[in-house]
Amino acid sequence: FGGTMKKRLSVLLLTLAVLLSGCSKPIDTTENSEKLQVVTSFYPMYLLAQAVTEGATELELRNMAQPQTGCLHDYELTISDMKLLENADVLIINGGGMESFLEQAMERYPDLVIVDTSHGIELLEEEEHHHHHEGETEEEHAEHSHGHDHEGNPHIWLSPERAAHQAEAMAAALGELDRADAELFAANAEAFHRAAHELEEKAHHIDIPEGECSAVFHEGFAYFAELFHMENVFGIFADEYQMPSAKELTEAVDEARGHGIRFFLTAADNGRIYAETLAAEVDEAIILLDPLTTADEENLSYLERMEKNIEAVEKHWKEETE
């Protein structure tokens, strides 16, 4: 992507648009009423919302998609999702085109307050995919959106600084609806932003030369390449529907050799085998990173999991330079 970024000015759906009929007052969260029911679309938003709402007494936080769902590309609402949203006051989404079911949810639940946390955040341009359906022509591949919003890369939670802005958007929105906890939300978001900034500083102090080449095998890891000032040469994204062809893999090996790529960033998913194959061709090791899209056994926080990712890159670089 060469550092190119694109401003996405999506609509912050909280802004009274869904509450124009005089319902824009704070939702009553006194002890005589039910608590504010807050739902997050998927696990990264749940992790951020946990940080923002820690210590709050007037809301209940639930996550919609199952903890092992992963990204929400092409996700369809289940019966249990619909039941959860029917009883929810607020739905917090990542935005940026991640939640393909959003229009359906808005139509089905017109009174649901939807907080789009991508509002005003700069998205990286979406990577040129190095995969397509077997037998597709290039024209068909270009038309095959695979459920993505091609205005930008929506995996913004993998940038600590952007995630901090998402947390602040959550705090501001929830504070308008739950005035009793508004100061708490703001303080939590501020503390999160400070910690996220420290993570970014830790990444920058690893002292990887600017412009070091990388290849990513998960779309979200373009944000990691940016964090470490890497030049991302290509991306290979595989799933159960799409796999890279032999020709594409051969071309990728040539690119890896030609650019001297030393950073192969992958998750423990379908892309891992391709990352390992290409890395082995140039006598390198993969860097296994956590996209934060699923629950982990240790129940770690967003900040803890991101710190482990940064440490994984640091460990790889130390081994490279020993």
What is the meaning of each model-derived region?
Residues 1-4:
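Short, Lys/Arg-enriched N-terminal segments with co-localized hydrophobic residues
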Residues 6-9, 78:
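Hydrophobic alpha-helical segments with strong N-terminal bias
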Residues 22-322:
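Extracytoplasmic metal-acquisition and chelation regions
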Residues 8-26:
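Sec-dependent N-terminal signal peptides of Gram-positive bacterial secreted proteins and lipoproteins
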